A protein has these predicted regions:
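ABC ATPase nucleotide-binding domains
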Residues: 66, 81-173
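ABC ATPase nucleotide-binding domain helices that frame the ATP-binding cleft
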Residues: 33-36, 132
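Helix-to-loop junction immediately C-terminal to a conserved catalytic motif
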Residues: 40
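The feature captures the beta-strand-to-loop junction immediately N-terminal to the Walker
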Residues: 25-27
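Conserved ABC transporter NBD signature motif
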Residues: 48-56
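Conserved beta-strand
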Residues: 4-17, 48
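ABC nucleotide-binding domain signature
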Residues: 23, 58-61, 67-75
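A position-specific signal in ABC ATPase nucleotide-binding domains
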Residues: 43-44, 91
Length: 173
């Protein structure tokens, strides 16, 4: 698979099993983020195909793919509260307000955000903003969740906690 004639990603075949956690390792500039962007539909391969759940999704629009992604450089909606940032993918897909409240509460508790749900991103530390972006990806019932170094900006204690807690969250999916 080749992107923009500058990044080559090897091997060309990658198979991910449903309900598993897979880790993509590589050196800086090896193409890990590029591969995840291709899988999410945010970038297109110059050759090859992307298959997910036995379906060719290479040309599928981003909105049609049930994928969540968190970048190392997190992104939050600056005018939304933490609650609204986390709930945004649920609201877009028409999840009821009761279920939204329950799911946001669960992921907020896991990521130690419960006391911050009424705050805006500019009132949070960098680690709290990263956890908000992570919560937004985890709250949605995605077929594929792509995490690009999601724990990199967190303090040591929380990073270690989440290394243990994240797999538990996926066990219930």
């Amino acid at each position: 698979m080749c992107i923009r004639d500058s990044t080559h990603i090897y091997p060309t075949n990658l198979k991910l099993q449903k309900n598993t956690i897979n880790i993509l390792l590589g050196s800086t500039l090896a193409g890990k983020t590029t591969l995840m962007q291709i899988m999410a539909g945010l970038d297109k391969p110059t050759s090859g195909e992307i298959w997910f759940n036995n379906e060719n999704v290479t040309g599928m629009k981003v909105q049609k793919r049930n994928v969540s992604m968190v970048y190392q450089q997190f992104i939050n909606y600056p005018n939304f509260t933490v609650y609204d940032n986390i709930a945004s993918p649920l609201k877009i897909t028409g999840v009821s307000s009761d279920e939204t409240k329950q799911r946001v509460g669960k992921v907020a508790e896991l990521l130690k955000l419960s006391g911050m749900l009424n705050k805006k991103p500019n009132e949070l530390s960098g680690g709290q903003q990263q956890r908000t972006a992570l919560a937004r990806a985890l709250v949605k019932d995605s077929d594929l969740i792509l995490l690009d170094e999601p724990l990199a900006n967190l303090d040591f204690k929380l990073r270690e906690e989440l290394r243990e807690e994240l797999p538990k969250l996926f066990e219930n999916r």
